[in-house]
């Protein structure tokens, strides 16, 4: 019994340490912020006038010159009413030497019609994927990002 508890405790500490290490690796290589924008008209993306949706805009700035691109395989909002259906991977390219900033967006949908969501600032997203480097092997990452502001305000 005690051995089983020690094993579970050890595994829990190992997975927690591994996740923190992946977040540090990501933060060392790239700086990323997330903005959001709701659709202007109901049904603009889906055709269903009762569905509210919008986009998350990922703004990335590389800190490591050897970073070629970021491949995002999974986006999970930490809000019960939001859903991201990622039908294909997201690639944030940094191919040119002078290009240190790049943006990419993904659509989200509000699942619950009774929920009124007006402001997503301070919300969080879990993302996971791979960092691809020029002369190193790819490094997987999982991190949590905070939603900073509306997309229009971030551009001004």
Task: Label every model-predicted segment.
Residues 1-31:
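A eukaryote-biased signal for short, well-structured alpha-helical docking elements
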Residues 7-9, 14-15, 57, 107, ...:
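Intrinsic disorder/low-structure terminal segments
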Residues 19-93:
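N-terminal topogenic membrane-targeting module
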Residues 48-52, 66, 98-104, 119-123:
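Solvent-exposed loop and beta-edge segments used for protein-protein assembly and interaction
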Residues 56-58, 70-75, 104-110, 125-131, ...:
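Hydrophobic beta-strand residues in large extracellular and virion-surface proteins
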Residues 85-117:
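Intrinsically disordered, low-complexity Pro/Gly/Ser/Thr-rich segments with frequent PxxP/GP/PP motifs
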Residues 112-154:
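Terminal connector regions
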